[in-house]
């Protein structure tokens, strides 16, 4: 059985359509003071239940929704509850940098999900793989790579070079470059403060080439747009970005529209706003089939890793 909150209903509908089933019957609403109200409208006793809800903006509302949904299902005697969180919010707060007096919020969220009654977590392209270790329950972190790679293959780009937007993304970019039999370039940037970045240097040959920037998410798009400009300044023929999660906060969409970026390709782990849908440089791919197949395999106790064996 698959239930969903209000964060990304379209994706949930696409997933159940792929599986040729119907969404579970659940009422999710708000009391007059804004508190979340959830009621399960069918029998779930002993059932294998999946709750599909990304914790995207409004992050705290969507996070509270999934907590209350899980609690309602647990109290209704669901047999096993899997929190399917395509985009895992708070994942960027996964450590204490330089002993700063800050929370490790990713761990807080992991604790909350387990206390609420989640038995297993399914997510996609976690910002930091080590977050899986914050849980004492199984975590399946699947990858949008096959979706994004398939789109690149279909477009039959020539003279490709895969670009890592920073040093931390080199492993992801190198894996893509290997699959595409393409060269690798790296952008060395310095980030003076949160959500502000400055492109400093490009390592690799990009002159006259089609550049593919691969990242797990695009937030304010400051890094992405500066990277595209730096690549064009170095003679790149075209710059395309492939990012799993379209967070697109602040003035990201306007920034992308006026940037040197030729196109941004994202998945639907997070729904695009009307402004995002209207942006001619943003294109969205569906991850419903991949999520649906993963849910089916988890429910049938089959291998998930074999989906990504190649």
Curated annotation (Swiss-Prot):
Catalysis: reaction(s): D-ribose 5-phosphate + ATP = 5-phospho-alpha-D-ribose 1-diphosphate + AMP + H(+)
E.C. no: 2.7.6.1
Free-text comment on the cofactor: Binds 2 Mg(2+) ions per subunit.
Residues binding Mg(2+) 1: 127
Cofactor(s), by name: Mg(2+)
Metabolic or biological pathway, per its Swiss-Prot or TrEMBL entry: Metabolic intermediate biosynthesis; 5-phospho-alpha-D-ribose 1-diphosphate biosynthesis; 5-phospho-alpha-D-ribose 1-diphosphate from D-ribose 5-phosphate (route I): step 1/1
NCBIfam families hit by this protein: PRK01259.1, ribP_PPkin
Name assigned to this protein: Ribose-phosphate pyrophosphokinase
Organism (species): Bordetella parapertussis (strain 12822 / ATCC BAA-587 / NCTC 13253)
Organism lineage: Bacteria, Pseudomonadati, Pseudomonadota, Betaproteobacteria, Burkholderiales
């Amino acid at each position: 059985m698959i239930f969903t909150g209000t964060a990304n209903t379209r994706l949930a509908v696409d997933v159940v359509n792929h599986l040729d089933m119907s969404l579970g019957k659940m009422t999710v609403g708000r009391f007059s003071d804004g508190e979340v109200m959830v009621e399960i409208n069918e029998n779930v006793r002993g059932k294998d239940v999946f709750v599909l809800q990304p914790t995207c903006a409004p992050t705290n509302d969507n996070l509270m929704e999934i907590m209350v949904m899980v609690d309602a299902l647990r109290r209704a005697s669901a047999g096993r509850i899997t929190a399917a969180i395509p985009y895992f919010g708070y994942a960027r707060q996964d450590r204490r940098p330089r002993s700063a007096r800050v929370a490790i919020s990713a761990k807080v969220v992991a604790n909350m999900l387990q206390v609420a009654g989640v038995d297993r977590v399914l997510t996609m392209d976690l910002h930091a793989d080590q977050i899986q270790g914050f849980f004492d329950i199984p975590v399946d972190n699947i990858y949008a790579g096959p979706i994004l790679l398939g789109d690149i293959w279909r477009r039959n780009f020539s003279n490709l070079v895969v670009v890592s937007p920073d040093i931390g993304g080199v492993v992801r970019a190198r894996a893509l470059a290997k699959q595409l039999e393409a060269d690798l370039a790296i952008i060395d940037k310095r980030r003076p403060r949160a959500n502000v970045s400055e492109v400093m240097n490009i390592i690799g040959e990009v002159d006259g080439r089609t550049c593919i920037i691969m990242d797990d998410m695009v937030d304010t798009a400051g890094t992405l747009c500066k990277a595209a400009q730096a690549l064009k300044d170095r003679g790149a023929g075209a710059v395309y970005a492939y990012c799993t999660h379209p967070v697109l906060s602040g003035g990201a969409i306007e920034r992308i529209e006026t940037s040197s970026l030729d196109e941004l390709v994202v998945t639907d782990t997070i729904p695009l706003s009307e402004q995002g849908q209207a942006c001619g440089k943003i294109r969205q791919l569906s991850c419903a089939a991949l999520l649906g197949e993963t849910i089916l395999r988890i429910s049938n106790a089959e291998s998930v890793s074999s989906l990504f064996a190649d």
